[in-house]
Amino acid sequence: MRLDKIREQKALRAGSVQPLYSTPTEELEFRPASHYRKKTSRRAKDLFSPLLYALHQRKWRRLVGPEVAPWAKTLSLDGKYRGNLAWRSAQKMGGAFQGKDVLLPGCHFNSAETRDWLATRVRSVTLIDIVDWTESFQRALPLLRQQYRPELRSFFGSLEKLPFPDESFDLIETRAVLEHVGNMEAAAKEMARVLRRGGVAIHAFGPLYFSAGGDHCIGAYGSKHVYDHLLLDEKAYQQRLRDEAAFEAMGKEKSDARYWAIQEIFSYLTPREYLECFRRAGFGGEVHANLSGSGCQFRRQEPEMWRKLVEAGISEEALLVSGMLTIQKK
């Protein structure tokens, strides 16, 4: 198993700052607001999601047992029926969004979360990413100003060292970012620093590293291999990861997904370690857990391999909780 290598990489990442990346050779092209308009079927689905979500809670709790994520206010299996739970909860916790200043780490101007917030009545939206999108942003800014009301800014930097004064924002949202942040301790403290008193931070992240397919790519080999990033030794894992012929046959999307594993850009944290980082930074609020359907299937169909994972010291919670949604107040 690769656990020693994972622990080593986790320690290295925890004491570092995420490297920054220069301007990509291919610039971002502006997408009009119509590109992000929800289909009628999607709007109908969002309307019924809260009811379906509530009706499935007992079923999903029975599926994993009481020991898995007892800290979670709700559970979801593969994100089903969660809908716009994040924004509903954030408004209950921090009030209406109108007139507020929003920070979106890990975003550029075409990101879905950017356009979601620009379509609201917030005062400003500030983007920051480890990739330098400055040139593309400056070209797109006149078009963005024509279509959206909020003030929009874009910065180049990392979560561990945010280039903003204390208490600059009312809201922070990240989507699929925190699973890649190595120094979560520093990132959580920085987000708390730039958030105003009473401000709300929304984080949806995953897959978490110890869950099924947690390296973002090994699950492409099939349902029996979703924990190979943990079960294989380092040499065998690297051979599987870098098998160009195999991934070429799987298609470009699955092949490109290897980027994160090859670069080792993960936090390597368990769900409870994330919660501790938030707590120490001064956040409190509600947490929702996303369960892995493929992880539950593996536990049922591969009992010997599952036992090996658990006996190696990985909790069933870390193996089955593939993602988290946190809505927390400073």
Question: Where in the sequence are the language-model features?
Answer:
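A short glycine-rich, Lys/Arg-flanked "PGG" loop and its adjoining helix->strand segment in the class I
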Residues: 185-200
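A conserved beta-strand element that flanks and buttresses the S-adenosyl-L-methionine
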Residues: 173
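Short conserved loop adjoining the S-adenosyl-L-methionine
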Residues: 161-166, 193
